[in-house]
Amino acid sequence: VIAACNRRSSVLIALDISAAFDTIDHDILCRRADSEFGIRGPALAWLRSFVSGRSSYVSVGGTNSPVTLNSTGVPQGSVLGPMLFALYTSPVSKIIDHHSLQYHMYADDTQLYTSLQPSQIDLTAIQLCTNDIHRWYAENGMMLNPTKSEVIAVGTRVQAAAAAASGTVEIAGSQVPFSSDVKLLGVTIDSTVSFDKHISSVVRGCNYHLRALRHIRPLITTDVAKSVACSLISSRLDYCNSLLHGTSAKNIHRLQVVQNDLARAVLMTGRRSSATESLKTLHWLPITERINYKIAVTVYKLRQSHSPQYLSELLVNYQQPRTLRSSDKLLLREPEGPVRKLALSTKAFSVFAPSVWNSLTLNCRMCTSLNSFKRTLKTELFIKAYTDQP
C-alpha cells in the first residue's frame, strides 16, 4: 500500500507446492537439522524417530493395497509439521535474499513480492528468483505446482493494470498470467486491496451458518446459542479483520448487518428490534470497534515482544527533541507528508496502527499485562461505541 502511495506498483507471487508435507525427505531433513540448526545427539535421534517408521496404504471399495513404509513426509496435522517444513525449506529464504526480493513464508505458503515503477516494469528479477526456487525444490524432492501458483499486481487501478499488462511469469515451465485476486491463508486479496471479494465470501459463509442457527435456536439455551454464534459466525467476522481497516463504509455495513442479525438470532428478538440494544446486551463490540480492538492488541504485543520484526519495525515511538508533557504518554509517531494525506494510506499498517494506538487513553496504553490491556481496551471501546447511541 505504501508503495502504491509512492506511485509504485507491487507484484506478488504466491507459490504452491504439490503434496508439500508428503515430499519431505527424512535424511535431508535430519542432515539439515544437524548442520544448519545444531540439532544433535538425543534431540536429533528423537526427531528421526518422529518422522520415520510410518506406513500407509490405499483403500478402494473395501480392498486395501499392500502396506508401504514411508520414506518421505511429515504429519501435516501435527504441531511439529509446519516447524519441520520451515526447517527443511530454510535455504529458500537465502535464494530470495540473493535476488533482493521480499517474502513471507509460513509452512508451505510462500509469497514473493517487490515494488516497481509503472513506467519501468521489469519482471526479470522475479523470473530468475522463481527459476532458482523451482530448481532447489526439484533437487530436494519437491515440486512447484504452476496450476495453483498465482501472480497478482497490487496498487491503484492504473498501477495494477500497468503491471498486469507487462506479461506473465514462468513457474515450473508454465506461463502463469496475472490474476485479479489471490487467496492467502484464507484471505482473498484483490489488486486494489479493497477486500470486496473477501467480504462477500465472509458474508456468504456467515449467512449460511446464521440460517442454521435460526433453525435450531428454539431448541437450545441462550448460552449455547452464544457459543455456537461465536464459534461458527463471529470467528469468521473476526478472522484477519485488522486488514479491513480503511475498507469502504459499504463493506463495513455489510459485515455489521450480519452481526446485527446474529445478535437478534441469539436473543430471539424480532427483525425490527434495536440491533444496538441486542449488541449491548450480549456485550459485543460492533464491527468497526472489533477491528480497532484487534489492531490495538497487535500493537501492544509488538511493543512488548518486537515480533514479528517486519511489523514491529513499522512502529516508531514518538519522541520530541525536548521534554514535553506528551513525551511520557507512550505514543507512536504517525507518518507525515504526502503519503499520509492519500486515501489509500489508511490501509497501510504503518499509518493506521499508530493512529488507533494513539487514540487510546493513557490508562489503557500503560497496562502492564496483556490480559489487563484487553479488559481495559474492551471497556474503553464499548463505552465509545455505545455512548449516546439511540
Residue ranges and their predicted role:
Residues 1-390:
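Hydrophobic/basic alpha-helical segments
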